[in-house]
């Protein structure tokens, strides 16, 4: 991905999915360590009944790439470091998706709770994250 020039996989342009209903969505997640397990568990208990499935791959790079390529509709993470997600922010945005904090503010380096999505499910996901 290059800012302003789209996102590509093997020289083919990629795009986020067009799904706009959460109940048709796959959602990836990652908790920011042991301190956030209860908080993440609380979020998962709200999200899981609303989606096809929750997935945890263990790699912010892989999870954001899957959202960018339309293989999932959203990814949320708590207490993550900027170097773990900065490439994924660009990738998802260039593929047509959205990246915000859990309130809906745009990503900044100091943002540690993040939601990446295809845009179509973003508002619904934000409502579930709080």
Question: What residue spans do the PLM features occupy?
Answer:
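Generic beta-strand structural signal
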Residues: 1-2, 109
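DPxDG-like acidic metal-binding loop motif
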Residues: 2-8
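An extended, acidic
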Residues: 14-130
